[in-house]
């Protein structure tokens, strides 16, 4: 049976030549996205009026992509997969990148469809499609997040039990490996089969693709609106209009990749010592439970607010329109947790 034990030297040591090549490929692909997005705009710079309007929309599309990278669901998916791959003794390089690429595929394809059909579809028809997609995505999100929070609550309880054993002087190294390997929805449901499925960073592409089908966030809806507006103007070709979703993808992939690399570094550092690893995972698992329940609760309020008897929940449900800000808070919390643990680790020997 394949062991899930991590080799600290491999995970915490210098990057191998293969890992550096993979990282260079990821960075190169992100650069190409930026170049394509800008080049499609520059190709129409001969028309000052049209190019000027597209430039403003392009900057906004890029910023929307950056905002979307900090969505709470992005951070949760990337964090969980990064941890899983490290448990398998592999240092992931492109988890965030391939997740963003899967997500971006949906955005680019739908933006193309919107651009091609902008003149044929009415505003009412577009709003109807958006409403149905948003409802389905919300139900899926509530179900997924509730299950994740429930499973992680069990793991958190087990980790707290291990912490009490440590304080009592017990050796928990083997138990810690077992408890941490239970984390994550698919790991708990599929067991070792999930570990066989997630072998490389590129396996996050279909995950990002599926999670992008809802297109329920304000960033994506705004991008599609920009695309439709540019297409209906009649002054730009489809190729030029596609610069908007490409710039959106460039911004999102840049920061999703940065997030996965940071979490790889943070978890690699924590895995070098069992006690450090236990404390770090208690903090991050607890945060996952709280965030999952909070987001699911907001989505439930948003659904119920459509019913007359629950109209008072509308202000709470409206929070779902600003989940990017929650993503910023989650990212900041993980950074502060890692920084605090790092400082504590440096100060601890001095106290002893």
Curated annotation (Swiss-Prot):
GO annotation, biological process: cobalt ion transport
Q: What do the Gene Ontology cellular component annotations say?
A: plasma membrane
User: InterPro entries this protein is in?
Assistant: Ni/Co_transpt, Ni/Co_transpt_high_affinity
Q: Which UniProt keywords apply?
A: Cell membrane, Cobalt, Cobalt transport, Ion transport, Membrane, Nickel, Nickel transport, Transmembrane, Transmembrane helix, Transport
Provide the membrane topology annotation. Answer: Multi-pass membrane protein
Q: What is its main location?
A: membrane
Q: What GO annotations for molecular function exist for this entry?
A: nickel cation transmembrane transporter activity
**Subcellular locations according to the entry:** Cell membrane
Q: Does the keyword Transmembrane feature in the UniProt annotation?
A: yes
| Family membership noted in the UniProt record | Belongs to the NiCoT transporter (TC 2.A.52) family.
Q: What does this protein do?
A: Mediates energy-dependent uptake of cobalt ions into the cell. Can also transport nickel ions, but cobalt is the preferred substrate.
- What's the name of the protein? Cobalt transport protein NhlF
Q: Which organism is it from?
A: Rhodococcus rhodochrous
């Amino acid at each position: 049976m394949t062991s899930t034990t991590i080799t600290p030297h491999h995970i915490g040591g210098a990057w191998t030549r293969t890992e550096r090549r993979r990282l260079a490929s990821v960075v190169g692909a992100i650069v190409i996205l930026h170049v394509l997005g800008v080049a499609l705009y520059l190709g129409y710079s001969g028309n000052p009026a049209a190019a000027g309007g597209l430039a403003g929309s392009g900057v906004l599309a890029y910023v929307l992509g950056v905002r979307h990278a900090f969505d709470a669901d992005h951070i949760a998916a990337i964090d969980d997969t990064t941890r899983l791959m490290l448990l398998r003794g592999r240092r992931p390089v492109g988890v965030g990148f391939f997740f963003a690429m899967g997500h971006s595929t949906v955005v680019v394809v739908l933006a193309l469809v919107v651009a091609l059909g902008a003149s044929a579809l009415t505003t009412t028809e577009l709003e109807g499609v958006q409403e149905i997609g948003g409802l389905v995505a919300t139900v899926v999100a509530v179900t997924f997040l509730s299950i994740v929070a429930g499973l992680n609550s069990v793991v958190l309880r087990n980790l707290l039990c291990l912490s009490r054993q440590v304080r009592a002087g017990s050796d928990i190294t083997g138990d810690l490996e077992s408890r941490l390997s239970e984390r994550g929805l698919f790991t708990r449901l599929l067991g070792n089969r999930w570990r066989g499925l997630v072998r490389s960073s590129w396996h996050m592409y279909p995950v990002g693709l599926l999670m992008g089908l809802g297109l329920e966030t304000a960033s994506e809806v705004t991008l599609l609106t920009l695309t439709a507006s540019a297409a209906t103007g009649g002054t730009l070709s489809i190729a030029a209009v596609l610069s908007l979703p490409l710039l959106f993808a460039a911004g999102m992939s840049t920061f999703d990749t940065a997030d996965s690399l940071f979490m790889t570094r943070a978890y690699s550092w924590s895995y070098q010592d069992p006690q450090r690893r236990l404390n770090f995972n208690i903090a991050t698992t607890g945060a996952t439970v709280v965030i999952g329940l909070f987001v699911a609760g907001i989505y439930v309020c948003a659904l119920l607010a459509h019913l007359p008897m629950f109209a008072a929940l509308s202000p709470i449900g409206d929070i779902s329109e600003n989940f990017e800000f929650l993503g910023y808070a989650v990212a900041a919390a993980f950074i502060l947790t890692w920084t605090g643990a790092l400082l504590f680790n440096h100060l601890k020997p001095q106290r002893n």
